[in-house]
């Protein structure tokens, strides 16, 4: 029976059958047409459709439908067709207005089409088109648009616009109520704070932009070097960049002071990677005798149009004044992108892109303006308050009998009750958010934490899904070599000394053979038995494997010079290579780990430049290899290779290493590679397959000519180059399989356990292979070892996805492991169903995920579940995911600071996530919920008093309190105690960490909901009525006594309500209470205009105020006591 349950439960079997009959009738009634000879869709159905399995969406559909088929579209796209009057009234008008405005803006600011260009060296005047200025501008406004822009940003929100209209209405004599400053002072304070904050931020941006744009660079001209500002650099200029200087624009690398014709650059501010990148100068210009000779040649660079991809470039360098003309292909290794830093030597480049066309600017996207769920909920409540305001005003006018100009009375009542919507709500919440951020950064238990987005700290307390990267986030990104497998023998960490012995034996025999052949000595004696032959065979294989690992990489040893200059340079062959200050630079930690391992077993990389590398054997002999070609690693090919020539033997060898999925079809047939890759992956090791192929001189010469020709192609260069390289990647000899371990970070297991107990579902999104990702998920206890795991089989069609989803549907409480390719197919056809099933899993592991897929998964969870998501990562490939999530957390790791800088919160260790969420996230949400509701209570209670007062006095639209009383009530009299609620806590941080189940209650939003809001409304109505009626009943003769009694009781009631709300007292809370009370008592002496000073000093005044205050507050204290006794909250059991 389980097989017959449809995955999409809304459609019953009868409904499906009815739909089948309707569609069959439709197709049969359509009659023959142009496609009559084509079989129907029912005839195209897979045989699998006749299984007992019910289909996921439409049982009558064939699996192999056209992509444009309506029924295969995601539901999010289908629902867009349902637009009508209801859609327009409920918000569709906003969408239409926004679309029209965007259309007009696009028409007015039409982007210039980007084109390829020809750039002549040192001749910017030859540029055929005008290019953007090379200036950086991060400012949002200029001197003319600052005030209008800031005001627009404030008043585009309904509430701020409402307060502006209310304040402006006081200029109309017929609508004026009290003093102008009663309304303009709070609004002016909010605007002044906002304008000052924006002005400071804008001035800082201006200073940063000015500093960058004013940096001086040396520009090479016919007359020599001249100093030029960065903002004045043009396309075609020859710019000289010194060591440790930022590259001002995108350039082609022409010359360097380094003898090797290459230099290192740091790209951490561009791609987030901390490893240095090797860049190569154009050989034609590097060979010129002098720097000034650049103007004696007639040369140009052809560059492709500006693009986003920072890892690719296609262009050509042409020198026309030589015979024949020189043509060199240009690739990414010949470029110097803006915002990178020269790490060695001095470089000269020709500018090809400036300003907005540089790679760094084009990849700088404006992240979405994140709005917290609490802010959205408060916005809904304020809309409800506005409706209550309008309803109350209409009721008052109705009871008044619409006498006289009723519309004027209606507007005056709207003004009188305007305090229902407190203008101080936004100010208090913003100040509270700033306080939460300060507390987070001051927490000694999570040192180094930085709050970069101060507007969403409450989001940390409402998370349901946590999406995390693996490498560098759950793991340390510190690679340690653990395993070498040769097929018949495997070496681990405890047997590395055997590899060292094999290397010593191999190189000793090589030296003896070389010495014996040169001296024409007697031939070597044969081995006495077969055992030595086996040992020599193993030694030879180990030697070949280690040598391949030591040669096939992109690692460069760098030595810090001890001289006065203190510059970093590559060691030469005649240097002392035993220097302790040697470091390895590479594009990946895996590469460094492999080279460090070969050094540990005796084969050391001591030198490398563009054309050669040198190895030192265990016996101290230096081996020199000429680098003929290098094929760097790409995410598409998943492998890298190098062709080298042994200088001593003239042998040419092609070495290659890569992922098993890429290398399996390249190496010769074997029966152990797939099995051992799986075994290593289950141990949590990152595997690489190493292979080689010997080449003859003729073979290499033929390859080189075809390779160089392909590199000069202007169209489809990448494909043509890949095709030529693939011609070599055939029947390669499998040498070994390496295993590198990426160790888990400290306290990852207890942190994940804590998050799981808090009700947070954790998804791991990684670009690593399936086996490794699964192993890390189990070793980190993301997936418990006793928990079932469903590995989603690779699917490529809709039918396969259908069957696999049905197989997954029958499993319960199991973790899901799926690859990025299979995920893409499932989302194409069954987006809603897949997300619905995946969200039911306790854990999900997505492997082989691209950065865009990571961000897409985050958006899918937001769209289909409506729950709050958090993304955490440490690399540049996690930035899109972090920015797409409701709350982004970046870890400062070995892959750089790009993720950290793009995140809302930055931490140094994954284990800090636990305290960040359980303590600070939980406290921030509960504090802001209490603060927001209390501020609304403060406005509701005084509006209730105004309503009672107006009702008693024949519905007159006369204010109860005027002038400074209203301003003081919203500020000095109650602001400090109310704001002190940001220090409140229901449980101690240690208890919140010990019992993460407390966090689970927050996801239900019970601390701030319409239920709690209605409770506060009832409290406000009760207290406002008691205060006003009590004052009216107890006053004797003068009306001013009513104001004195009611207002004093109101202030005391607010202070007592804060005390009632507080759960854990802080000394600053006591100070705030006493300070506010002291300010009010002291101000009584100066409020002769509002109070009778002689009356407020009498005992009668004191007992009347005390009686009214007790009646308004005592029942609430009793109710709170009874609730704690009869139905205590979960946290009270722990705090007691």
From Swiss-Prot:
Q: What is its EC number?
A: 7.6.2.1
- One GO term (biological process): retrograde vesicle-mediated transport, Golgi to endoplasmic reticulum
Q: InterPro entries annotated for this entry? A: ATPase_P-typ_cyto_dom_N (IPR023299), ATPase_P-typ_P_site (IPR018303), ATPase_P-typ_TM_dom_sf (IPR023298), ATPase_P-typ_transduc_dom_A_sf (IPR008250), HAD-like_sf (IPR036412), HAD_sf (IPR023214), P-type_ATPase_IV (IPR006539), P-type_ATPase_N (IPR032631)
Can you tell me which residues bind Mg(2+)? 469, 471, 874, 878
User: What cofactor does this chain's UniProt record say it requires?
Assistant: Mg(2+)
The alphabetized UniProt keywords are: ATP-binding, Golgi apparatus, Lipid transport, Magnesium, Membrane, Metal-binding, Nucleotide-binding, Translocase, Transmembrane, Transmembrane helix, Transport
**GO MF, one example:** ATP binding
**Localization:** Golgi apparatus, trans-Golgi network membrane
Q: Which Gene3D superfamilies match?
A: Calcium-transporting ATPase, cytoplasmic domain N (3.40.1110.10), Calcium-transporting ATPase, cytoplasmic transduction domain A (2.70.150.10), HAD superfamily/HAD-like (3.40.50.1000)
Quick check: keyword Ribosomal protein in the entry? no
Q: What is its main location?
A: Golgi
Entry-linked CDD domains: P-type_ATPase_APLT_Neo1-like
* UniProt-annotated binding residues for ATP: 469-471, 591, 633, 638, 657, 686-687, 766-768, 848, 854, 877-878
Region annotated Disordered sits at 514-538
Stretches in topological domain Extracellular = 167-174, 405-408, 961-962, 1034-1041, 1088-1098
Q: Which domain of life is it from?
A: Eukaryota
**Could you confirm whether the keyword Magnesium appears in this record?**
yes
Tell me its family. Belongs to the cation transport ATPase (P-type) (TC 3.A.3) family. Type IV subfamily.
What is the name listed in the Swiss-Prot or TrEMBL entry for this protein?
Probable phospholipid-transporting ATPase IIB
Which species?
A: Bos taurus (Bovine)
Source organism phylogeny: Eukaryota, Metazoa, Chordata, Craniata, Vertebrata
Encoded by which gene?
ATP9B
């Amino acid at each position: 029976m389980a097989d017959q349950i449809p995955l999409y439960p809304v459609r019953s079997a009868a409904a499906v059958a009815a739909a089948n009959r309707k569609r069959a009738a439709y197709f049969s009634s359509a009659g023959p047409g142009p496609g009559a000879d084509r079989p129907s869709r029912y005839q195209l159905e897979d045989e699998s459709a006749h299984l007992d399995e019910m289909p996921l969406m439409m049982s009558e559909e064939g699996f192999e439908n056209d992509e444009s088929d309506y029924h295969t579209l995601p539901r999010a796209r289908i629902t867009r067709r349902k637009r009508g009057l209801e859609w327009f009234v409920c918000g569709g008008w906003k969408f239409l207005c926004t679309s029209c405005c965007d259309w007009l803006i696009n028409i007015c600011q039409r982007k210039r089409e980007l084109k390829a260009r020809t750039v002549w060296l040192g001749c910017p005047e030859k540029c055929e088109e005008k290019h953007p200025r090379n200036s950086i501008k991060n400012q949002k406004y200029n001197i003319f648009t600052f005030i209008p822009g800031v005001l627009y940003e404030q008043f585009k929100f309904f509430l701020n616009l409402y307060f502006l209209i209310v304040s402006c209405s006081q200029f109309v004599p017929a609508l004026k109520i009290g003093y102008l400053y009663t309304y303009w002072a709070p609004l002016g304070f909010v605007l002044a704070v906002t304008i000052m904050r924006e002005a400071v931020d804008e001035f800082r941006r201006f200073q940063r932009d000015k500093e960058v744009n004013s940096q001086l660079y040396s520009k090479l001209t016919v007359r020599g070097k001249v100093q030029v500002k960065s903002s004045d650099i043009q396309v075609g200029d020859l710019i000289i960049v010194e060591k440790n200087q930022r590259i001002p624009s995108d350039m082609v690398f022409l010359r360097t002071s380094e003898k090797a014709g290459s230099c290192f650059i740091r790209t951490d501010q561009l791609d987030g990677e901390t490893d240095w990148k090797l860049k190569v100068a154009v050989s034609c210009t590097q060979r010129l005798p002098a720097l000034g000779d650049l103007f004696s040649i007639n040369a140009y660079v052809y560059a492709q149009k500006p693009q986003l991809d920072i890892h690719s470039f296609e262009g050509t360098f042409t020198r026309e004044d030589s015979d024949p003309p020189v043509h060199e292909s240009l690739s990414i290794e010949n470029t110097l992108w803006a915002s990178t830093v020269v790490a060695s030597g001095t470089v000269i480049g020709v500018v090809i892109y400036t300003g907005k066309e540089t790679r760094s600017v084009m990849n700088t996207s404006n992240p979405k303006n994140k709005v917290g769920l609490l802010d959205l909920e408060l916005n809904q409540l304020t809309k409800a308050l506005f409706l209550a305001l309008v309803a109350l005003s209409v009721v008052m006018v109705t009871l008044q009998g619409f006498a006289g100009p009723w519309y004027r009375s209606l507007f005056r009542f709207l003004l009188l009750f305007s305090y229902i919507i407190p203008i101080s709500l936004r100010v208090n919440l913003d100040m509270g958010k700033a306080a939460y951020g300060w507390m987070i950064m001051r927490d000694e238990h999570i040192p180094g934490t930085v709050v970069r987005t101060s507007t969403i700290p409450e989001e940390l307390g409402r998370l349901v899904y946590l999406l995390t990267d693996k490498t560098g986030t759950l793991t340390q990104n510190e690679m340690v070599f653990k395993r070498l497998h040769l097929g018949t023998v495997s070496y681990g960490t405890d047997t590395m000394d055997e590899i060292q012995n094999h290397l010593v034996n191999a190189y000793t025999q090589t030296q003896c053979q070389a010495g014996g052949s040169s001296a024409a000595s007697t031939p070597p004696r044969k081995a006495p038995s077969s055992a030595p032959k086996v040992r020599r065979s193993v030694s030879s294989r180990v030697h070949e494997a280690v040598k391949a690992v030591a040669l096939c990489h992109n690692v460069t040893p760098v030595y810090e010079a001890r001289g006065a200059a203190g510059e970093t340079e590559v060691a030469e062959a005649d240097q002392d290579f035993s220097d302790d200050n040697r470091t390895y630079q590479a594009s990946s930690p895996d590469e460094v780990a492999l080279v460090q391992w070969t050094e540990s077993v005796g084969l050391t990389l001591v030198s490398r430049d563009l054309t050669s590398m040198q190895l030192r054997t265990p016996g101290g002999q230096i081996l020199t290899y000429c680098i003929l070609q290098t094929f760097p690693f790409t995410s598409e090919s998943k492998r890298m290779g190098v062709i080298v020539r042994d200088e001593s033997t003239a042998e040419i060898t092609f070495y290659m290493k890569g992922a098993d999925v890429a290398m399996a079809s390249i190496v010769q047939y074997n029966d152990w590679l797939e099995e051992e890759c799986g075994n290593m992956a289950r141990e949590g090791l990152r595997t690489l397959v190493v292979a080689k192929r010997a080449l003859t001189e003729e073979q290499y010469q033929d390859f080189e000519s075809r390779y160089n020709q392909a590199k000069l192609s202007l169209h489809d260069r990448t494909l043509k180059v890949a095709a030529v390289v693939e011609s070599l990647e055939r029947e390669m000899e499998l040498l070994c399989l390496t295993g590198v371990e990426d160790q888990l970070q400290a306290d990852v297991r207890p942190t994940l356990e804590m998050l799981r107990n808090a009700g947070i579902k954790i998804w791991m999104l990684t670009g690593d292979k399936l086996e490794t990702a699964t192993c890390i998920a189990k070793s980190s206890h993301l997936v418990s070892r006793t928990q079932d795991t469903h590995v989603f089989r690779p699917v490529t069609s809709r039918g396969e996805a259908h069957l696999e989803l049905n197989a997954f549907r029958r499993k319960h409480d199991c973790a899901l492991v799926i690859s990025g390719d299979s995920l893409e197919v499932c989302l194409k056809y069954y987006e809603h169903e897949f997300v619905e099933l995946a969200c039911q899993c306790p854990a999900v592991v997505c492997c082989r995920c691209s950065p865009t897929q990571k961000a897409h998964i985050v958006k899918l969870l937001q769209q289909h579940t409506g729950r709050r998501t958090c993304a955490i990562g440490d690399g540049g490939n996690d930035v899109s995911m972090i920015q797409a999530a409701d709350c982004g957390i970046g870890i400062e790791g070995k892959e750089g600071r790009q993720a950290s800088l793009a995140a809302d919160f930055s931490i140094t260790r994954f284990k800090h996530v636990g305290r960040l969420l359980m303590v600070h996230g939980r406290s921030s949400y509960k504090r802001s919920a209490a603060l927001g509701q209390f501020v609304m209570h403060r406005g509701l209670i005084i509006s209730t008093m105004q309503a009672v007062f107006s009702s008693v006095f024949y519905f007159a639209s006369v204010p109860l309190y005027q002038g400074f009383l209203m301003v003081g009530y919203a500020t000095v009299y109650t602001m400090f105690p109310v704001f002190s609620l940001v220090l409140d806590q229901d449980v101690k941080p240690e208890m919140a960490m010990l019992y993460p189940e407390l966090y689970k209650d927050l996801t239900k939003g019970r601390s701030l909901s319409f239920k709690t809001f209605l409770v506060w409304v009832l409290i406000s109505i009760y207290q406002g009525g008691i205060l006003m009626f009590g004052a009216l009943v107890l006053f004797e003769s003068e009306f001013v006594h009513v104001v004195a009694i009611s207002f004093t009781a109101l202030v005391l009631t607010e202070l007592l309500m804060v005390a009632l709300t507080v759960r854990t007292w802080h000394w600053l809370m006591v100070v705030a209470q006493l300070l506010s009370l002291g300010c009010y008592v002291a101000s009584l002496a100066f409020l002769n205009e509002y109070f009778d000073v002689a009356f407020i000093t009498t005992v009668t005044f004191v007992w009347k105020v005390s009686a009214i205050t007790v009646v308004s507050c005592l029942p609430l204290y009793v109710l709170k006591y009874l609730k704690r006794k009869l139905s205590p909250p979960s946290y009270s059991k722990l705090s007691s």
